[in-house]
Regions:
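Catalytic cores of RNA-modifying enzymes
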Residues: 1-210, 247-255, 262-268
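A short, ordered amphipathic alpha-helix with a cationic face
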Residues: 192-195, 223, 227
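Conserved Class I S-adenosyl-L-methionine
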Residues: 179-181, 216-217, 221, 227-268
């Protein structure tokens, strides 16, 4: 019982359905037999997904696992994999130092840090061409939704700026131990062709966050709360944040940059 509580505290719900594990594994593209792609599994647990990844000849599998009990289990059951298993926190990992030539990411992501995992992927978008992750269903819906949806939000915009996102399939509660209280879903992110935005990218993040900070209000009011009064109007001001596409937010960011006095643009 204490071990189960510990897993819950880590946000971990271990997948027990082998067919779903195979399906998740097959959803990730790889390299070739001659040039296998590096793949990092985040949260290997007891190796339910790991075992199928290790069967592929087009990938070299690495793992990130923070739970000492799981690490010990994996060392005992997959000794050939053990040298590539990193005991530690994925969120603190130096991906560039370890995978300078790029790495695909996959995993049954702990619910309590799934959004943080996606933010880390955004930060390392030049290194991560693809990600397949199982997350809480509401998170999967949120990041895959187009503009105009109530679920569309900050993470939706920031991920869709750099990745094409597919909601692959829903996963029920009974295939986990311990069973979560919500449904899960698997999503796939594939790097799009955007290499840079036509605006200040740090300011873009600030504008997106400010816009959704009071998402029920018109953008005029949401932005004013962070940037102050511009003394001018933009055509998006009567709209709400959820109505704007990534391209719209790029346009709005450039307008904010052009209409703020030099040195007054918040960067934090």
């Amino acid at each position: 019982m204490d071990q189960v509580r510990a897993k819950k505290a880590l946000g971990q719900h271990f997948l027990t359905d082998l067919n779903i594990a195979r399906k998740i594994c097959a959803s990730l593209s790889g390299g070739t037999f001659e040039a296998p792609a590096a793949v990092l599994e985040v949260g290997c647990g007891m190796g339910v997904l790991t075992q199928f990844l290790l069967q592929r000849c087009d990938v070299v599998v690495y793992g990130a696992e923070i739970d000492a009990e799981s690490v010990e289990y994996l060392h005992g059951h997959y000794p050939d994999f053990a040298p590539r298993l990193i005991e530690g926190d994925f969120l603190k990992m130096d991906l560039r130092g370890r995978f300078g030539s790029g790495v695909r990411v996959i995993g049954n992501f702990p619910y309590n840090i799934s959004s943080q995992i996606f933010f880390k992927i955004i930060e390392n978008r030049d290194l991560v061409p693809e990600c397949v992750g199982m997350v809480q269903r509401e998170v999967a819906v949120r990041i895959a939704e187009p503009p105009g949806s109530r679920e569309y939000g900050i993470l939706s915009v920031l991920l869709q700026a750099w990745y094409d996102i597919e909601y692959l399939f829903t996963v029920g509660e009974k295939v986990f131990n311990p069973p979560p209280k919500v449904k899960s879903a698997v999503v796939r992110l594939r790097r799009n062709g955007v290499r840079s935005l036509d605006c200040d990218e740090q300011l873009f993040v600030k504008v997106v966050k400010a816009s959704f900070g009071q998402r029920r209000k018109m953008l005029r009011n949401s932005l004013r709360a962070v940037f102050g009064d511009f003394g001018a109007e933009h055509r998006f001001f009567p709209m709400r944040a959820e109505q704007l596409s990534v391209a719209d937010f790029v346009e709005l960011t450039q307008w904010v940059a052009d209409n703020m006095p030099d040195g007054d643009i918040p960067r934090g």
